[in-house]
Amino acid sequence: MKKNIFKFSVLTLAVLSLTACTLVPGQNLSTSNKDVIELPDNQYDLDKMVNIYPVTPGLIDQLRAKPIMSQANPELEQQIANYEYRIGIGDVLMVTVWDHPELTTPAGQYRSASDTGNWVNADGAIFYPYIGRLKVAGKTLTQVRNEITARLDSVIESPQVDVSVAAFRSQKAYVTGEVSKSGQQPITNIPLTIMDAINAAGGLTADADWRNVVLTQNGVKTKVNLYALMQRGDLRQNKLLHPGDILFIPRNDDLKVFVMGEVGKQSTLKMDRSGMTLAEALGNAEGMNQDVADATGIFVIRATQNKQNGKIANIYQLNAKDASAMILGTEFQLEPYDIVYVTTAPLARWNRVISLLVPTISGVHDLTETSRWIQTWPN
């Protein structure tokens, strides 16, 4: 009898060891033997911290952003009309006195005007024959021409003078970030606008976030929406660039949404320049899992700004039991860091529980059969 009991115990342990691992699937992290920090808000009711809205045509209209209309920019037009370049340190000037070649530095066949012109020294002055040292930094070309004409009038009868900039080296604006050729761009006698600077930099890259461009002028940052400017014709977004301005085009890495739950492939998706709809996000995640997904429970979880009214998130629910409701998904625009979650159908949850219990039930059945066999085992 003792021999049978021993055999039965061994077989029982073997069967239990094979079935025990099926009782609790996946990894586990126990907190029972660890220090758990108690926080003042440990006890909270999550249900009271969210708002849930069914996705309806009315909600789509309510959430839809106001259309961006084409707008003129009279302020920029006035700035361009009044624009005059002011000479700076490092510029190279070309001074021409008609009928007096001895006063005009010849460029020569193999020498550019920038090599032979009058360089503006660190003190902001140039040297010119019959005049000597002449302060030019901060002045316009018209002011310098008038001053040279007046100074030469005592040695030349009715001098005809022309002054131009042979090389613009003193003042620069900077275009950085997601453009084809980032770097500095000279401020010249031709006004430089945001559009001009981006075109000169080779345009935007595929990863550019053109809705959140930042222009820094005199330490003050201004948001520029290139989408509104380029796609919608809102010319108010175009601004005149000044020396030292920085135009930064960020990457769209932060423009992402998360698709979780019963989809073909749980994913982190990056939004492109045109944005992303709920239908696009589901499509990029290989759609709903038709075997286990609950089509009535397609949720978009969106964090609220500054926990308005004590709410941490707004949740939008799309009931797509009727597939034609997915047309609403094509109109629902996602925002960065939205979470798209597709719930599991109740029957699928039950099937999963059963699938976990079947190995255990089989093990118990095997154990019962083994017990009967042992009881009939000859001594």
Swiss-Prot record:
Cellular location(s): Cell outer membrane
Record GO biological process: monoatomic ion transport
Family annotation (Pfam families): Poly_export, SLBB_2, Wza_C
Keywords, alphabetical: Cell outer membrane, Ion transport, Lipoprotein, Membrane, Palmitate, Polysaccharide transport, Porin, Signal, Sugar transport, Transmembrane, Transmembrane beta strand, Transport
Primary role: May be involved in polysaccharide transport.
Covalently attached lipid (S-diacylglycerol cysteine), positions: C21
Membrane topology recorded in Swiss-Prot or TrEMBL: Multi-pass membrane protein
GO terms assigned for molecular function: polysaccharide transmembrane transporter activity; porin activity
Gene name tied to this protein: gfcE
PANTHER family in UniProt: POLYSACCHARIDE EXPORT PROTEIN GFCE-RELATED (PTHR33619:SF3)
GO cellular component labels: cell outer membrane; pore complex
Highest taxon of source: Bacteria
Sequence similarity: Belongs to the BexD/CtrA/VexA family.
Residues annotated as signal peptide: 1-20
Entry protein name: Putative polysaccharide export protein GfcE
Residues with a covalently attached lipid (N-palmitoyl cysteine): C21
Species per Swiss-Prot/TrEMBL record: Escherichia coli (strain K12)
Family matches, as PROSITE patterns: PROKAR_LIPOPROTEIN
